[in-house]
């Protein structure tokens, strides 16, 4: 919120800055945020001219999100300070610990999804 963005808008910008082209479903899976929040953020960013949606050629139900040129610039200004902090943390903790952390988080997410789906 310090950078003038809601959490869900921040993660959308962050993910698209790093991955260029993602579907709403992929953003939801990567962030574990509610689909409604991600959808709201995508529509807001689209309406502000920062993001475009493009339908998949093979499946009309699938839409890819892309940052516009203005959106990339906006994302860099808003997200770069967070990327800089990430880089400092990686340097302090070391690559091995970060890899372990990512493996543990992935395991946690898989188990969470499994138990959630069982309910």
Where is each model-derived feature located?
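N-terminal helix-turn-helix DNA-binding core of bacterial DNA-binding proteins
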Residues: 1-37
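Short acidic DE-rich linear segments
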Residues: 97-99, 113-119
